[in-house]
């Protein structure tokens, strides 16, 4: 997992998208060191963007993006989503509302989100350099990103082997939502199609 994730929200602000991408590269390199030579990279949300970028830096057999942002309403939605995540995390920690409000008044994720926005712009500009087989997965009613990001990825990758799948009953975190079993089956079928 990326540095600062699944931790108090202040921890994520001590990191950056550049560190997270290095975490993805390190994960790939670890698999190679373990003897794996046919690696498919998959990622949810920002992880999907990193899967695309990783394919430009390492030899991959295929790519799966799930609800990966490419711009549009993404920056503001990520900011609001991150504030909501921070509030919920603080509630989960058992803090009272007054403490949460006080901590949130001092919680300013703008620099990290600015770096994230710049990283997304760079990845968007390089999508046309992706030529590996790809499965693009997107929910129709995504509350975090612009669902048209999926069409952008699909339309701009330079892969001859590409597919896009849409899901109408799930939210942004599709891997734990109503259609997760169908998503897993679609990914399995994609993996089986790679020779």
Where are these regions (language model features)?
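Catalytic active-site module of serine/aspartate enzymes centered on a nucleophile-bearing elbow/loop
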Residues: 169-195
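Gly/Ala-rich beta-loop-alpha elbow adjacent to hydrolase catalytic centers
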Residues: 43-47, 51
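Catalytic histidine neighborhood in serine/cysteine hydrolases
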Residues: 155-173
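Short alpha-helix in the alpha/beta-hydrolase fold that links the catalytic acid
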Residues: 132, 146-155
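Short beta-strand/loop motif that positions the catalytic acidic residue
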Residues: 130, 136-138, 142
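Active-site nucleophile elbow and catalytic-triad environment of alpha/beta-hydrolase enzymes
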Residues: 109-126
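Active-site nucleophile loop of the alpha/beta-hydrolase fold
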Residues: 64-75
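Catalytic nucleophile-loop/oxyanion-hole region of alpha/beta-hydrolase
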Residues: 7-36
